[in-house]
Amino acid sequence: MRFLLCLILLLHSTVLAGGLQWEKTEVAIEAFEGGGKVPGELKFTNTSDQPIRIRAVPASCGCIVAKPEKRDYAPGESGVIPFTYAPKRKWGTRAYRVYVVTSEAGAPYEFRFVVTETRR
């Protein structure tokens, strides 16, 4: 009984903690030969009761550059992180990772980018 009570309290506090809620965590990109850079954005909302700071947005490949328009988001505030994919002229499908490091405790948010480059 005591274990169940502790588990309920733990889950309840986790839900209340909130954080950044993302519109999606997987991004599909299609790039075509001669088409140039492909823009996009990661959309989110701060569902916590605390301000959250975006500290860094590293990617597993230099072909993806993501730069937040601002760093600090108040509780309830929504935002976007624009990104650009620069085609590498490597035809086919590959996967990359983008991470969003915030002021929250724990691991950074992770996004999977599935890129398909097609030769015309």
Locate the predicted segments by residue:
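Sec-dependent N-terminal signal peptides
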Residues: 3-13
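Beta-sheet-dominated interaction scaffolds and their linkers
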Residues: 16-47, 114-120
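Short structured motifs
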Residues: 23-29, 39, 64-69, 81-84
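Short, solvent-exposed loop/turn segments enriched in Ser/Thr/Gly
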Residues: 34-41, 88-97
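Buried hydrophobic-core signal for structured, non-transmembrane domains
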Residues: 40-46, 81-83, 96-101
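Short, acidic/polar linear motifs in exposed loop/turn regions
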Residues: 47-50, 89, 104
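Surface-exposed binding patches on compact interaction domains or structured appendages
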Residues: 49-77
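Terminal connector regions
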Residues: 91-119
